[in-house]
Regions:
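Transmembrane beta-barrel wall of Gram-negative outer-membrane proteins
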Residues: 94-234
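Bacterial N-terminal signal peptides that target proteins for export
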Residues: 1-9
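Flexible, solvent-exposed coil segments and beta strand-coil junctions
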Residues: 37-43, 80-86, 132-142, 189-200, ...
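Bacterial N-terminal signal peptides
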Residues: 8-17
Length: 391
């Protein structure tokens, strides 16, 4: 029975005939899901990967940035998306969903600033169904298989950053992974017409995730025209603990080191460019997966430009444009799936003092495409973040 369930789930993942649900990508079905970057609207609009940007920031991937602007700060980020997909089997459709990938606060202390953030890490939610014919009681009968996987993994991060001199900062954060996943499988026999039709078969399983991470980073301003930043994240094994009524063993998954590098350069007053990169090798996790999945390393890069001279009613209204490209760590079918995104956005300063933004809204709109051997997605994604600073 256990092998039957595993085979049935695998068939549903491969078939991937998906109904519109609250998911943001069908690549959530591959491996451990789709990584979610914990970045704000400004970084999204600039195609930035969350490191090396001028200005205050509470981005988990750039722990030193908070130390460059030591005042109480809070941020919240919301993100809806709309996805059109096309599967190689001929199935196509649309899905949509929303999430809050980042919430964080920072408060000064001990000549630096302490930070606390809750961020998304891996999104695993999707729903699929398929119809097939079975030979029951000597006649062909249609049944429906329904599979839903509801879950995600987030990270609670506690960090500290402090300036080094007047133009640099060091920072670190300790993270605790947490989350759960519920898998539900149902074979629906309700369409059968003969007497004494079979009752629908249902089964479910649940795992709870836990793990730890440690991120360290540095940031430095080169005069007033450039910033460079780098960070490294180490993660221990991600442990999945099965519930008491789940037929299966506890699992453990190897997570990769993540390396980030970013820079911002002011070319002229009101004109800034930015570039960033991130690399992580997920190959070691392949042996921990129980379903065939193409696993690879991710090498993502992003570039962008910000025009900050625009204003409305005396308040800054910077315009931003960006582009990013890279690979997904988990793919359906053979070959590694890729992702490329064009982005644009703007910021609105609600309060500022001496050119320092104390309160503002950053918005971004992205048009992207994910392409693999059996699945292609075209999507729109919006990101809105609210940031407030000051005593």
């Amino acid at each position: 029975m256990k092998q039957f369930i595993r085979t049935l789930v695998l068939a549903l993942i491969i078939t991937l005939v998906t109904a519109p649900v609250g998911a943001q990508s069908l690549y959530n079905a591959a491996g451990m899901g789709l990584p979610v970057e914990a970045i704000d609207g400004r970084a999204r609009a600039l195609g930035n990967l969350g490191i090396g940007l001028f200005g205050s920031g509470l981005l988990p991937g750039d722990p030193a940035a908070a130390g460059m602007f030591i005042v109480p700060t809070a941020i919240i980020v919301g993100q809806p998306s709309w996805v059109d997909y096309d599967h190689g089997s001929g199935n196509s459709g649309s899905i949509q969903g929303s999430r809050f990938p980042l919430m964080g606060v920072g408060y000064p202390g001990f000549s630096g600033i302490f930070t606390l953030s809750l961020s998304s890490f891996l999104d695993q939610h999707y729903k699929s169904q398929r119809s097939l014919e079975l030979d029951l009681r000597g006649e062909k009968s249609e049944v429906t298989d329904l599979f839903e996987q509801d879950g995600s993994i987030g990270s609670l991060n506690f960090g500290y950053s402090r300036p080094i001199g007047t133009s640099a900062a060091l920072g670190f954060s300790f993270g605790r992974y947490a989350g759960s996943i519920l898998r539900q499988l149902e074979r629906d026999f309700s369409t059968l017409s003969f007497p004494g039709a079979l009752e629908s078969y249902q089964t479910s399983s649940r795992w709870t995730y836990s793990g730890s991470s440690l991120t360290g980073g540095m940031a430095a301003n080169l005069g007033t025209f450039a910033r460079v930043a780098a960070s490294v994240t180490w993660s221990g094994d991600l442990n999945a603990t099965a519930s008491d009524d789940t037929p299966g063993m506890d699992r453990s998954f190897s997570l990769p080191m993540q390396y980030r590098l970013g820079t911002s350069i002011v070319l002229a007053p009101g004109l800034m460019i930015t570039a960033s990169a991130i690399r992580a090798d997920w190959a070691d996790i392949e042996r921990d997966l129980d379903t065939p999945t193409t696993v690879g390393s991710t090498s993502n890069i992003g570039v962008g430009v910000e025009l900050s001279r625009a204003n409305i009613f005396g308040l800054a209204l910077p315009l931003r444009f960006g582009y990013r490209t890279g690979k997904l760590p988990f793919s359906l079918g053979t070959g590694v799936a890729t992702e490329r995104i064009f982005s644009a956005g703007l910021g609105l300063s609600l309060s500022q003092a001496d050119d320092i933004v104390l309160g503002g809204v950053d918005a971004a709109i992205e048009r992207g495409r994910r392409s693999g051997s059996v699945l292609t997605e075209a999507f729109w994604r919006a990101t809105i973040s609210l940031r407030v600073s000051g005593y």
